[in-house]
A protein has these predicted regions:
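Short amphipathic alpha-helical segments, especially helix-boundary/capping motifs
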Residues: 17-18, 84-89, 116-120, 186-193
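Inter-Walker segment of RecA-like/P-loop motor cores
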Residues: 48-109
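Conserved helicase/translocase P-loop NTPase motor core
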Residues: 88-128, 135-150
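Conserved helicase motor core of SF1/SF2 NTP-dependent helicases
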Residues: 1-59, 65-73, 127, 134-235
């Protein structure tokens, strides 16, 4: 996780290329919210993979696909549509979902509905990497989690201060739920030296200068504002 411009998309692309180079037989999905990211992700993954192997990626095993998707395959492929097809649950297109659930978060609603209607979960991918996770509901991340083969490798990148919804992304304990004994299905363990980190914060921003960032935070959070004593204190 990190601010916009901290390199989250670059890290995801590099990780995808590395995993594909180490495990060429794995089925890997890279998904996102903004359609224009697809070309950028493909170019980055291709470049990083060639740097590591001097070969082109096997795009049959690396799927760069949109989150929603539609029938027809190819450019229309998507995570949600693949889940519905594999688990024999009803698929909703954008217009149908919006008409039924409104404009607030129709995609999150249909993801939750698909999860509740699926009798079993068919594993499809070995790894799923999600960019712009702050723009998705927890239901979509749970849907991705249920599409994974054991040991369920899910990587998601997000910016807590930049999202299309009014809510921030909950903790993994909330997103993925609990087991029957009450323990979390997913829990980020504290960092132990010599072991991979599970929660990584990208602290540098390469897109904006420090004065611009400090000014934006001061205005956005109202740091120097003096609210009225009888007011709410909110900006």
């Amino acid at each position: 996780r990190g601010l916009g411009g901290s390199g989250k998309t670059i890290v995801l692309a590099l990780k995808t290329a590395y995993l594909h180079a180490q495990h060429p037989d794995w089925k890997i999905a890279v998904t996102f919210n903004t359609r224009s990211l697809k070309g950028q992700l493909r170019q980055l993954i291709n470049t990083f993979y060639i740097e590591q192997t001097s070969e082109e990626p096997d795009w049959d095993n690396v799927n760069i696909i949109h989150a929603w998707g539609a029938p027809g395959g190819g450019e229309k492929a998507g995570i949600y549509y693949a889940f519905c097809s594999a688990n024999n649950v009803e698929y909703y297109d954008f217009l149908t979902a919006r008409n039924k659930y409104g404009r607030t978060d129709p995609f999150g609603e249909i993801c939750a509905k698909a999860l509740s209607e699926a009798k079993t979960f068919e594993p499809i991918y070995d790894v799923i990497l999600v960019d712009e996770a702050q723009d998705f509901s927890p239901a979509f991340l749970r849907l991705c989690y249920e599409m994974l083969k054991e040991p369920r490798r899910l990587v998601y990148a997000y910016d807590e201060l930049q999202n299309l919804r009014s809510q921030s992304l909950p903790s993994p304990e909330v997103i993925f739920g609990k087991l029957q004994d009450g323990t979390p299905r997913v829990k980020f363990e504290p960092y132990i030296e010599g072991y991979p980190q599970q929660d990584i914060i990208l602290e540098k921003c390469y897109r904006n200068s420090r004065p611009a960032l400090v000014t934006a935070h001061a205005l956005g959070f109202g740091i120097y504002r003096s609210p009225e004593s009888n007011g709410s204190g909110l900006v």
